[in-house]
Amino acid sequence: METTMTRRDFLKSAGAAGAAGLVWSQTIPGTLGALEKQEIKGSAKFVPSICEMCTSSCTIEARVEGDKGVFIRGNPKDKSRGGKVCARGGSGFNQLYDPQRLVKPIMRVGERGEGKWKEVSWDEAYTFIAKKLDEIKQKHGAHTVAFTARSGWNKTWFHHLAQAYGSPNIFGHESTCPLAYNMAGRDVFGGSMNRDFAKAKYIINMGHNVFEGIVISYVRQYMEAIENGAKVVTLEPRLSVMAQKASEWHAIKPGHDLPFVLGFMHTLIFENLYDKKFVQKYCTGFEELKASIEPCTPEKMALECDIPADTIKRLAREFAKAAPKAIFDFGHRVTFTPQELELRRAMMMVNALVGNIERDGGMYFGKNASFYNQFLGEEDPKAKGLKKPKTPAYPKVEVPRIDRIGEKDGEFFLANKGEGIVSLVPKATLNELPGVPCKIHGWFIVRNNPVMTQTNADTVIKALKSMDLVVCVDIQVSDTAWFADVVLPDTTYLERDEEFTAGGGKNPSFGIGRQKVVEPLGDAKPGWKIAKELSEKMGLGEYFPWKDIEDYRLQQVDGDLDLLAKLKKDGSASFGVPLMLQEKKSVAEFVKKFPGAASKVNEEGLIDFPKKIQLFSPKLEEVSGKGGLGYEPFKYKEEDELYFVQGKTPVRSNSHTGNVPWLNNLMEYDAIWIHPKTASKLGIKNGDAIELYNKFSSQKSKALITEGVREDTLFGYFGFGHVSKDLKRAYGKGVNSNALMPSFTSPNSGMDLHVFGVKVKKA
């Protein structure tokens, strides 16, 4: 059943949001507000899909409800999220119908960053882009164009287009957020790890604020653990919501997480609190690890992290006593120290030392089809993976990536080629990268906003202004699109179908991706279609042989119509039964389901790991001399500066949702947290206009005086201070903290650094 909603109906339904700034604007070419008439057509039945208001990708259902707009709720079939959505997820309808969203292609007619645009047809936009890409290819080589896409399904299409074009320089957003913990997982465990928070009895949390960053499944698990009596200890410089929920909050010195973890680990090892049997059977490199951290006593590390040695030792002893139902949470955004790879490896090693791997209330391997199948007998049915549709081989590229990922002895050998070290793109453009294989002449950016998400925004803007071509695919004129030559209008997540995905928690599963709830508004197109049509204009159509997204999906499931129908109806499908390799009851249930797996069970009724856990990295030792662990002091700020740290708010998603009317109305700017003693010394009172400044930039905001932050530290929420004047609600409000950050790339991990120094004064 289809429901049609006219522009008059829409304006009527939007009236309730008038106070939130939902004004029908005629000032921005190519926007929904510039259309004279628009019918909104969609399903009156609930359609299972995936939210895209942040990168957590929660499962949802949505439908059109007459003249009331689109109703969004959590998918009730998803037990991990309990059928819930957060404030951001609930505002998806508001983003869909935002008059300031882009629904037609636009091209720059003034200087970059001047904000002068004209509407163009898709054919005109494609022709311009294809011609410019060919010119760069002929003059400088295809490898001099970088392609960046935010993590998600759009990345599939545009990274494929990039490699068909001949560029190896494809990037995601990970080096500005979670890359180091993914690298650490590959180094220590050989792959990704999941956390069973709900069954844990003791959790150490170092700034992984799931209550404000909001991952609904994690929120529910943490709350279940707390309600069941688990002890949660939080270490971070400010009193976050996570810290408020915790049993203990310790205000650790910014950027000094690693000394705490090393002192904690030192206690486990040198007081013989670790699980000797587990380490001996399943781990390698223990003696090398022990030797590397011997100097890192709790007493020495306490002087660095500002947590007393007695506290470090007490927490380690309590943690070991609670194991294996104890988790040292390795976090998500990992941009706090130049030694991020060492820090995240250390956190993961702590879990291995207490033997919590593949245990209830501990950590476990993500079990996709290939991982799961290795424990099945020959006669047992196997979990299916998704097939990748066949395409021609990519052209051979002779020039290495600018980050040299893929080279045998490259510094960032643990990084994924599909993510890369994106912060190197501006440096390679401006010739600020010693030994770079090439200069970047063009940047194709898909639903990513480096002006707001990369450090030292002025450098990013300078790089954008110097390029031969900048193309953005987005739903709005973002801060980066503000400096583009062409902006192509992507659909919102409620207007498109996407590819299927395969993954696994405790057993393999498939996901629907996203399903279209309403027809695209204006002339917006989904990413798969933009990439396919542009490839045809570029003479690369053979690389996109599928007719449409439905054809692509059918090839993914190898023509399995039953699986196709189930995924479209339910939104997900799983295989087998949950498996925890070191839990006898789970292994017994697994063997009951798959009798052939009995041959994999050891004398203890458990299943051994497929490979050893690595507590010392021979490859890292070879490349950087850092196979073990150790602490290297770093100067984050000058003596007369304060530390600045940032975090997420539950009503903003990085730089993505600042202009969404409802969310902007909930939080227009980010007041900066200042300790009362610090504010008193500076003559600053609550609510005063203030200026933050250092040698890189200056930003203005308001003061929030609170004891919930260290005296030597300022705190602000991320996602404010937008520079695009076409984001009319969000422009110029609050602090873009990235503008104040130095351009620093952490060794071995390639992470940006989000802890830095600033001065503050009354504005």
Swiss-Prot record:
The keyword Acyltransferase does not apply. Disulfide bonds: none annotated. GO terms for molecular function: 4 iron, 4 sulfur cluster binding; metal ion binding; molybdopterin cofactor binding; oxidoreductase activity. Residues 44-100 form the 4Fe-4S Mo/W bis-MGD-type domain. [4Fe-4S] cluster binds at C51, C54, C58, C86. Residues 1-34 form the signal peptide. Its cofactor is [4Fe-4S] cluster; Mo-bis(molybdopterin guanine dinucleotide). The keyword Protease does not apply. Binds 1 [4Fe-4S] cluster. Binds 1 molybdenum-bis(molybdopterin guanine dinucleotide) (Mo-bis-MGD) cofactor per subunit. InterPro entries: Asp_de-COase-like_dom_sf, MoPterin_dinucl-bd_dom, Mopterin_OxRdtase, Mopterin_OxRdtase_4Fe-4S_dom, Mopterin_OxRdtase_prok_CS, MopterinOxRdtase_cofactor_BS, Prok_Mopterin_Oxidored, TAT_signal. Pfam families: Molybdop_Fe4S4 (PF04879), Molybdopterin (PF00384), Molydop_binding (PF01568), TAT_signal (PF10518). Keywords: 4Fe-4S, Iron, Iron-sulfur, Metal-binding, Molybdenum, Oxidoreductase, Signal. Predicted to be exported by the Tat system. The position of the signal peptide cleavage has been experimentally proven. Belongs to the prokaryotic molybdopterin-containing oxidoreductase family. Component of the phosphorylative electron transport system with polysulfide as the terminal acceptor. Functional polysulfide reductase is made up of three different (A, B, and C) subunits. This is Polysulfide reductase chain A. It comes from Wolinella succinogenes (strain ATCC 29543 / DSM 1740 / CCUG 13145 / JCM 31913 / LMG 7466 / NCTC 11488 / FDC 602W).
